[in-house]
Structures are given as structure tokens and as C-alpha cells.
Amino acid sequence: MNTSHYSVLGHAVPYPKAYDPSLLFPISRAVGRAQIGIGVVLPFVGEDRWHAYELSWLDARGKPCVATATFHVPCDSPYLIESKSLKLYLNSFSAEVFNRAEALRLRIAADLSACAGAAVAVEFGLPPVGGGDKEISLDRLNVDIEDYGPPNPDYLSNVAQNLIEEMVEETLTSTLFKSNCPVTGQPDWASVTVRYFGVPIDHEGLLRYFISFRHHAEFHEQCVERIFQDVLQRCSPQCLAVEARYTRRGGLDINPLRTTSEMAWPISVFRDPRQ
């Protein structure tokens, strides 16, 4: 089984001069999920949406072409794709000739699907930069913070647990999220959004919980699944969606989304202003 310790992540490697799909490195999702009590039956649906900003190849006349692209990796794939390996793989197309851009798109889709162990959708272009109109920013809260890790789900609670609770639908977001790469220790910055329907969640507690990831080392996808599990278990919403929009590194950004139901949450896809 592949682990991140055997990948190119954290190692100096030469940039490829020719197309090489073997550069792609899969990491089993099962290992990280076992640590937070997720087994074979997943409590969520969703995807890891990648935005690629540095994609280039040669046309039939040898002229360089450039494009951006979006990749959709389903969360029920057995493997996630390690980010540095994806960067190197995409760079390996820089001297590869394609008569049509569609041929490149199909090649990338086939290679990423083989790496992830499930069908990966690939499209040229990026979502627009934007934001949710009804989002409530937690960053405005005037709170004292002293806990920066490990992630502490004890901060999560409902506002009124012993009263007749009224159900609400809220979209809560924070740009203050930071975690760290488990291999290199590099900081990973993100905007995190929690959308739910249920008994009101305590806003200050949720912000403190987000900030308790600040010294935590875990892959982007695993952080989002940990947040999903903790909020679901501690606050018991009837519907829940968690998405993190991580800032760009190496020409890529990662946007994991986990939700209780595809039908319950029509997702408005956009890029964060920091991406």
C-alpha cells in the first residue's frame, strides 16, 4: 500500500521532460478514515475538486498551448491523489504533442481515474471567484484564543440543549483555518464553510474548533472529513455540508466537499478570492 513517506512529497526531484503517468502517486483513504472512525460505509458523499492553473502542451505544429482545468475526484474513490505528484504529472505534458485539446483532456481523465481507482471528471476552465450571499462569517467574533491543537471537538456544541430547540439553516464560514502538511510541515491555508440544518450550532465554539487545527498535521481531504465527523457527532444536524477551499500551491488548489446528501445541498461552485 502506498503511503506519503514513499511519495515525491518532501523530496527534491527533477522536473520531468516527457509525459509520465507513473509520476501520479495514490494514497489510501482508508488509513486516515480509520483514525476518525470511518469504515467502509461512508457517512457522506462528495468530491475533491482540484483547480489546475499551470497546464501546457504542444499543438500539432509545435506551438505551446496553455489552459486551466478542474478535476473532480469522487470521495468514494479508494485513493486520494498526492498533490506534488499531480503537479509533476501535469508538468510532464509541457513537451507532449496533441492534435486536439480534447485528446489531452481524455488522457488526463484516464490517468487520474487509474490513480484514484474511480472515474475522475476533467474539464477545461475554472469556476468563477465568488462567495455565498448568505454566509455568516465567524471571523468577526471577538474571542480570546489559546488552543491551537490538536483539534478539539469539545468546543462544538448546540446553543440550547435543554430548551425546545428551533431548527435553523445556516452557512457558517471562516478564512482563519490553517492546518499543516503531514510530510513537509508546510502550512496549508483555507477558507472553511459549514452549512447545516438543525439545532443552532454555537458560533464561538465552532471558530475555536477551527483554530484548534492550527498546529495539526493532516492532508486537506482528511481535515475536512474530521470536521464533518466531529460536527455531525457533537451537534447532530439533520443535514450537513463541509467544504474547505485551500489556497494554491504548485499551481494547484484543493477543495474537498463532504455532505450528508447530494440532493439536500445544491452546491454553488466558486473559487475563494485567495485562490
Swiss-Prot record:
* Binding of NADPH, residues: 83-84, 249-250
Any one Gene Ontology molecular-function term assigned to this protein's record: preQ1 synthase activity
Q: Where in the cell is it found?
A: Cytoplasm
Q: Which domain of life is it from?
A: Bacteria
Gene Ontology terms describing biological process: queuosine biosynthetic process; tRNA modification
SUPFAM superfamilies from the entry?
A: Tetrahydrobiopterin biosynthesis enzymes-like (SSF55620)
Q: One cellular component GO annotation, for this chain's record?
A: cytoplasm
Its EC number(s): 1.7.1.13
Q: How does it assemble?
A: Homodimer.
**Which family does the record assign?**
Belongs to the GTP cyclohydrolase I family. QueF type 2 subfamily.
Function according to Swiss-Prot or TrEMBL:
Catalyzes the NADPH-dependent reduction of 7-cyano-7-deazaguanine (preQ0) to 7-aminomethyl-7-deazaguanine (preQ1).
Q: What protein name does the entry list?
A: NADPH-dependent 7-cyano-7-deazaguanine reductase
What's the source species' lineage?
Bacteria, Pseudomonadati, Pseudomonadota, Gammaproteobacteria, Lysobacterales
